[in-house]
UniProtKB/Swiss-Prot annotation:
Role of this protein: May help in the organization of the PsaE and PsaF subunits.
Cited SUPFAM superfamilies: Subunit IX of photosystem I reaction centre, PsaJ
Superkingdom of origin: Eukaryota
GO cellular component entries: chloroplast thylakoid membrane; photosystem I
HAMAP family the record matches: PSI_PsaJ
Protein name: Photosystem I reaction center subunit IX
Name of encoding gene: psaJ
Keywords attached to this entry: Chloroplast, Membrane, Photosynthesis, Photosystem I, Plastid, Thylakoid, Transmembrane, Transmembrane helix
Spans through the membrane: 7-27
InterPro entries (UniProt xref): PSI_PsaJ (IPR002615), PSI_PsaJ_sf (IPR036062)
Provenance organism: Hordeum vulgare (Barley)
Length: 42
């Protein structure tokens, strides 16, 4: 059980989860607001 905790706490796993969540967030933002290039002009 300790080996599983050690594996889940290493940086590649955490960075994969982080970048996956960030990619999902960016996809949802682009789905709700399709043209992000128009944001600076508001």
């Amino acid at each position: 059980m300790r080996d599983i905790k050690t594996y889940l706490s290493v940086a590649p796993v955490l960075s994969t989860l982080w970048f996956g969540a960030l990619a999902g967030l960016l996809i949802e933002i682009n789905r709700l607001f399709p043209d992000a290039l128009s944001f600076p002009f508001f």
